[in-house]
């Protein structure tokens, strides 16, 4: 009986994947690609690029929501896989 209970607990933890956290790139164009572990409730990686004075500026990181804003030369890309915001 104890073996069955232990098996059920292990299967429950494996199915819920309690320890999973998303990783996203968090650099800009001037730094080498580095990653960050996102908070538990974060579902999106983002890449935000804009052109200012003829120079492309870019930011990457984790985001709770996925804003779909495209204005003033600004572009935001969101994705849900690990390190998908390269």
From Swiss-Prot:
InterPro entries: Snake_3FTx, Snake_toxin-like_sf, Snake_toxin_con_site, Toxin_cobra-type. Disulfide bonds join 24-45, 38-62, 66-78, 79-84. It is found in: Secreted. CDD domains: TFP_snake_toxin (cd00206). Keywords: Disulfide bond, Secreted, Signal, Toxin. One of its GO terms (molecular function) is toxin activity. PROSITE patterns: SNAKE_TOXIN. SUPFAM superfamilies: Snake toxin-like. GO terms for cellular component: extracellular region. Gene3D superfamilies: CD59 (2.10.60.10). Expressed by the venom gland. Residues 1-21 form the signal peptide. Pfam families: Toxin_cobra-type (PF21947). Belongs to the three-finger toxin family. Short-chain subfamily. Orphan group IX sub-subfamily. This is Cardiotoxin homolog TA-ctx-like.
